Amino acid sequence: MKVRFGKKAVVVAGVLTLVGLVLRTEAGDKFGSARGRTYVAACPAVTESIPRTPGPYRVMVIGAHPDDADIDCGCTAAKLIAKGARVKFVAVCNGNIGHHVYDRAKTAAVRRQETLNAAKVWGLDSYDIYGYEDAGVPYDIPTREVIARRIQEFEPDIIITHRDCDYHVDHRTVGMHVKDCGYMLGCPHWIKGGKALRRRPLILLMGDSFTVPREIRPDILIDCDPYMEKWCEALNCQVSQFYEWLAWDKGIEDEVAAIGDRTKNIAGRNTYLMKYWTKRKIADAKRFAAAWQEQHPGKVVPKRVESYEISEYGRPPIEEDFELLMGD
């Protein structure tokens, strides 16, 4: 069956396209033609214009495991905290499969303590672990409501989470749950006893290397270079991961042994951490160099960046969001 559009429909579509382009062009001057500005008119369900309540920004990074937020968003968190924002990290899973020697119970206990140590380094409001088992986050209504209730309690201005396309089932599931919450967070009768948000959060999707169905769109790029020392210090707290499990998984245990005393050989420790866990940050700085120059006219492309895509499932960004994220 062929579908035909009348002349009026074509004209209306053309006008709407032009209006969208005008809004997109006018939306971003200070940070060049940052593609994130195109979302002023691109969030069809969440188009609210409710102003921000004065006070520190609240940012909630919802990752699947107790090191996801640190690895992929740590430099962003360090920047925002330095600018006065309140930042909360979340691990929906307890990390109990993340070791090759410890049993599940011990792994979960060790990782909980490691996240507490990392939280102190970052200066987080908190580092919450919801307790689901690794590779066991259900994609169901009760789990979605657990996540939604925690979001409503913190009332974030911005949420950062995973994209749907990712190598780990927990990453995909958590990302879908957060996006599913997006519009519903403002509905008073959705969560029984919950606190509906009068102003829904902006949702950002953290960077990844996947290209199917498409690569991430670099709407917002954060310079990591000024924060790498703190990033290394925080990752160093998660001994079971970066010096044990992941080293074993990658077959690089000999490099860990070569570091020796990590409390003394800080340079060696940091070199090791950056060698293996900043590859994406370095790759993104290269592949998104043109986007960086659009967003930060006149500034040299950094060596490492954290990249984010603005999700259409959250509210549209406002000038304050870009100033917090992309401003000096």
Where are these regions (language model features)?
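Short acidic, glycine/proline-rich loop/turn micro-motifs
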Residues: 99-102, 214-218
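Bacterial N-terminal signal peptides that target proteins for export
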Residues: 2-12
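Internal alpha/beta domain cores that form substrate/cofactor-binding pockets in large enzymes
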Residues: 88, 116, 121-208, 216-217
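Active-site rim/loop-helix segments in enzyme catalytic domains that contact anionic ligands
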Residues: 26-154, 184, 325
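Bacterial N-terminal signal peptides
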Residues: 12-20
